[in-house]
Design a protein with these regions (language model features):
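Beta-propeller domains with acidic blade repeats across secreted/periplasmic ectodomains
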Residues: 1-174
């Protein structure tokens, strides 16, 4: 609708973890003249700790970045489409996803018709606590076994990849 696409850059992927010491970027590409080609681009954010983010979702003035072990929410307070740590906010919404710079781990978020955020993670496993203080233990036959066979606070035992939904504030994951 606005001619923009947001892209997560993954130059620092696995073997190349330190290829770009200044960190990877979340880029904005814009088609300003409606010809279907991006003619303007800029970095929304680039930080040294950004290493191969696997997903980016733009929800109003929030930019949700999926990068293990965290789901990070950048709030563009002044809506200028550039993250400024002096003005804007950065918050780790959820943390505990396994698989550093790994494509089998945490991926992008999307908003459902019910207003909840839907997201998925691959088979690397996870142990995370949502904002309603419930801990989820996702076992993995692929990586670490720390959560294997252990029930989550909702009573279920999870193994492998999973899909979840939650309130936008990170509460009530299910």
């Amino acid at each position: 609708k606005d001619g923009r696409i947001w892209v997560s850059e993954g130059v620092n992927y696995r073997r190349h973890y330190d290829r770009k010491p200044e960190g990877d970027r979340i880029m904005v590409l814009e088609d300003t003249d409606g010809d279907g080609q991006a003619d303007k681009e800029w970095a929304f954010v680039q930080e040294p700790f950004l290493r191969c983010p696997m997903g980016v979702a733009v929800i109003d003035n929030k930019v949700v970045v999926s990068m293990t072990p965290d789901m990070i929410v950048y709030t563009d307070v002044n809506r200028d489409l550039v993250f400024d740590p002096e003005v804007d906010k950065r918050e780790v919404l959820l943390s505990g996803f396994n698989g550093r710079v790994h494509d089998h781990s945490l991926h992008s978020v999307t908003v459902g018709p019910d207003g909840q955020w839907y997201w998925n993670a691959g088979n690397c496993g996870a142990v995370f606590t949502d904002r309603s203080a419930r801990t989820f233990r996702i076992g993995s036959s692929y990586m670490t076994q720390e959560a294997a066979g252990k029930a989550s606070d909702d009573g279920h035992v999870y193994v492998g990849g999973f899909t979840a939904r939650m309130n936008p504030d990170g509460s009530w994951v299910n």
